[in-house]
């Protein structure tokens, strides 16, 4: 799942710029399933949009109306429902919410906007809680 991916960046939609970075796996999913031509988000900012995806709630209900506010971590996350149904769950990338990722078997996330050169990730697994990556 991607919370901040422009339609024109996916080859299946036919945008000329999609040739810069082809998306064959997403294109296959679109060919075998469905292509959304009228999809909308509840909030166009990355963190509030992510909070809406994670909770299924509007921003005013989940507490993450702006970048600087914090999500109400007592709300049930979609990842917790997936775990409860027996799925393995993981999240990798920018988390940027005020709570630790919950409902994930594995995570490797940037806590905040952070620095993108030699970033420090919050992680589960062999590296413990934090691991610094080298480079971009």
Show which residues each predicted segment covers.
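Formylglycine-dependent sulfatase
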Residues: 1-136
């Amino acid at each position: 799942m991607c919370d901040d991916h422009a339609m024109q960046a996916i080859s299946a939609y036919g945008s000329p710029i999609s040739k810069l970075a082809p998306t064959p796996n997403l294109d296959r999913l679109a060919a075998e399933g469905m292509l959304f031509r009228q999809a909308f988000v509840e909030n166009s900012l990355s963190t509030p949009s992510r909070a809406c995806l994670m909770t299924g709630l509007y921003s005013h209900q989940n507490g993450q109306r702006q970048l600087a506010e914090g999500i109400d971590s007592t709300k049930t996350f979609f990842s917790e429902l997936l775990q409860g149904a027996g799925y393995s769950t993981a999240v990798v990338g920018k988390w940027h919410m005020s709570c630790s990722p919950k409902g994930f078997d594995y995570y490797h996330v940037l806590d905040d906007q952070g620095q993108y050169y030699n970033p420090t990730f919050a992680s589960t697994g062999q590296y413990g809680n934090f691991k610094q990556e080298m480079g971009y």
